[in-house]
Amino acid sequence: MGRKIFISYKYSDSGVYPLNGNYSTTVRDYVDELQSKLKEGDHINKGEADGEDLSEFKDETIWTKLKDKIFDSSITIIFISKNMKALFQSEEDQWIPWEISYSLRELTRNGRTSGANALLAVVLPDQYNSYEYFIHDNSCPYCNCITLKTNTLFTILRENMFNIKSPTYNDCSNHSESNKVYTGESSYVRSVKWVDFIDNFDIYLQVAYNINENKDEYTLHKSV
């Protein structure tokens, strides 16, 4: 049986590395690249066009626009890109936070209930083929840990990272008590670089599904 995947992304963000030598590449091209590699039977629903003004919409109106795309999906992939977040616009007036919010809610339609989706954040390279805007590799010279710059994300996305209820940490003495390094699957929203994801996407989708099966171990934040 094919997977039903919802993809949330910033349509118009061109601050990404060119695909196949195309210097007008946008995030949408990365979505198309993934779609071309999925198995027959897998189905993708894409997020809303980001040019639409949400400021006058009520919650119910937003849900009406999203419900058919999200309700039947089992996993939501969020494409993280450098300019995904409009800095001078309220988060409530942007589509991505709402798409994440509804992906996390248990929803009922026509007597059938859909549980919270698995979530996976796929981090796209910026125009310089770098992931440093979000992922800092080897941030500690002793334990070679990775730092995720979650402060750059939408609030709902940030709050669903490092949100495991009973965290475990490594024993690196180079980190203070308030800056300990998490181990294991510490985030409900797992992050992966595009370069690692695209040729092994089945593995990472399964990781997200496994986390979802243990969602009670995480504090889920569902509000925009």
UniProtKB/Swiss-Prot annotation:
Keywords: Antiviral defense, Cytoplasm, Hydrolase, NAD. Disulfide bonds: none annotated. One of its GO terms (molecular function) is hydrolase activity. One of its GO terms (cellular component) is cytoplasm. Its main location: cytoplasm. One of its GO terms (biological process) is defense response to virus. Pfam families: ThsB_TIR. InterPro entries: ThsB__TIR-like_domain. It is found in: Cytoplasm. Activated upon phage infection. The keyword NAD applies. It comes from the Bacteria. Its EC number is 3.2.2.-. It is an enzyme of class 3 (hydrolase). Homodimer. Belongs to the Thoeris B TIR-like family. One of 2 TIR-like protein components of the Thoeris antiviral defense system, composed of ThsA, TIR1 (thsB1) and TIR2 (thsB2). Phage infection activates this protein; by 70 minutes post-infection with phage SPO1, TIR1 generates a signal molecule that activates the NAD(+) hydrolase activity of ThsA (tested with B.cereus). The signal is similar to cyclic ADP-D-ribose, but how it differs is unknown. Expression of Thoeris in B.subtilis (strain BEST7003) confers resistance to phages phi29, phi3T, SPBeta, SBSphi11, SBSphi13, SBSphiJ, SPO1 and SPR but not SBSphiC. This is Putative cyclic ADP-D-ribose synthase TIR1. The gene is thsB1.
